[in-house]
């Protein structure tokens, strides 16, 4: 899927994504450990994490975006979300490593909705938040998801260990599963 997001008077950048969600205000979002994976639910989207690396990429992106969110979303009481033509929902499953996450901040004057935006792309998921409440809901969601992932996969350090400088190990993540299959 190619989305063309108008951000300037020049040719709009192309954003490659499988699923995009645009969020404003506090919203219900949950992460649970179920069937040896982490299931995340938020408005219109369900994400299943079946590999540890996307959990790490998302957590790293949302926590590193806090300073940018504070700057670009300062003073934004409630963002603007385009009205969909109908009810739309999507589901993504991350069962392999994804490229590094991308975080972009757009001030209101460059935003297609004329509301400030913080965009976080992880794998095929693009999440756009337009105010501090939406950012906080997503930060809490991905922090909870990462905590579940760190309990599920032993190669992920805890949130506290990450803060102290520990790094995850992804070099042999498939080896135990392959060894079990060969036995």
Regions found by a protein language model. Give the residues of each.
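Positively charged, low-complexity terminal tracts
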Residues: 1-183
């Amino acid at each position: 899927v190619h989305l063309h997001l108008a951000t300037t008077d020049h040719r709009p950048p192309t954003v490659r994504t499988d699923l995009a969600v645009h969020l404003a205000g506090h919203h219900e979002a949950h992460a649970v450990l179920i069937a040896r994976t982490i299931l995340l639910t938020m408005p219109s989207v369900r994400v299943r994490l079946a590999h540890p690396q996307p959990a790490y990429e998302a957590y790293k992106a949302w926590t590193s975006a806090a300073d940018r969110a504070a700057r670009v979303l300062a003073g934004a009481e409630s963002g603007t979300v385009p009205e969909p033509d109908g009810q739309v929902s999507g589901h993504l499953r991350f069962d392999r490593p994804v490229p590094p996450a991308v975080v972009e901040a757009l001030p209101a004057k460059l935003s297609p909705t004329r509301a400030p935006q913080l965009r976080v792309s992880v794998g095929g998921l693009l999440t756009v938040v337009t105010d501090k409440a939406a950012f906080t809901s997503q930060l809490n969601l991905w922090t909870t998801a990462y905590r579940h992932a760190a309990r599920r996969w032993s190669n992920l350090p805890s949130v506290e260990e990450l803060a102290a400088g520990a790094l995850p190990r992804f070099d042999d993540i498939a080896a135990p599963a392959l060894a079990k299959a060969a036995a």
